[in-house]
């Protein structure tokens, strides 16, 4: 803490002749080889999940996210900070994730075998205890412009450092050129399970007018 009399005191400031500041030069384009590895994992997935956060909103990458998710046909969820990045009325949208999120989003997150995280932090409100969330058989792909955010809370199998808008666009381009397609039978079974979780209608409550709620 700094005493109030110090913060309100007036003084003469000697300006330096020059100022040298280390600038921040983020990597914008994702590594092509890493993107290729990520797509290979996504093609082999039996229970895929796409988990997006506020980085998609800040990166103005909603259009790129929608194009990529729809091309795959995989389920997608947003964190609180990522709401609005994907249309809430889209059938592939699972609702918000985390302690205040939907049952189906949280169950799919916990049971997926390949997880693509885009502009998200793996916050404790989303994954709970990292030790319990981590599973050897679950493969995690993490896209983020900040390299310090990758493998910060959970171990990541395929890190991709880059601007989410650029990376998602490149992933879509590479996806369209692939001869391999998602496992249709496995994906159908996965969506069947998701619909069972969704059928619980977790946000529903008794709307009787007898009691003010």
Give the residues covered by each predicted segment.
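Conformationally flexible catalytic loops at phosphate/diphosphate-handling active centers
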Residues: 1-41
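Short beta-strand elements at the ligand-binding edges of bilobed clamshell
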Residues: 23-29, 88-101, 153-166
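Glycine-rich beta-alpha junction loops
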Residues: 2-7, 54-56, 122, 147
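Short acidic, glycine/serine/threonine-rich loops at helix termini
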Residues: 8-15, 60-64, 87-92, 126-130, ...
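Short internal beta-strands
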Residues: 1, 73-80, 141-144
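Phosphate/diphosphate-binding loops
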Residues: 98-149
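Phosphate/pyrophosphate-binding active-site segments
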Residues: 2, 14, 20, 40, ...
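Anionic-ligand anchoring segments at beta-strand to alpha-helix junctions in alpha/beta enzyme folds, i.e.
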Residues: 30-31, 37-115
């Amino acid at each position: 803490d700094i005493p109030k009399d110090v913060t309100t005191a007036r003084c003469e400031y000697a300006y330096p002749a020059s100022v040298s500041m280390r600038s921040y030069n983020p990597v914008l384009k994702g590594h092509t080889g890493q993107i290729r590895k990520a797509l290979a994992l996504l093609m082999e997935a039996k229970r895929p999940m796409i988990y997006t956060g506020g980085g998609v909103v800040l990166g103005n990458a909603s259009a790129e996210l929608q194009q990529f998710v729809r091309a795959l046909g995989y389920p997608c969820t947003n964190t609180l900070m990522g709401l609005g990045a994907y249309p809430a009325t889209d059938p592939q949208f699972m609702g918000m994730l985390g302690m205040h999120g939907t049952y189906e989003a949280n169950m799919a997150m916990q049971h997926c075998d390949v997880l693509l995280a885009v502009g998200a932090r793996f916050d404790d409100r989303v994954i709970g205890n990292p030790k319990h969330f981590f599973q050897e058989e679950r493969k995690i792909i993490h896209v983020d412009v900040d390299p310090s955010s990758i493998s910060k809370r959970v171990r990541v199998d395929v890190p991709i450092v880059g601007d989410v808008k650029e990376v998602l666009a490149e992933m879509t381009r590479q996806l369209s050129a692939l001869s391999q397609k998602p496992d249709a039978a496995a994906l159908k079974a996965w969506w069947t399970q998701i619909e069972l979780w969704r059928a619980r209608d977790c946000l529903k409550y008794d709307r009787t007018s007898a009691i003010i709620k």
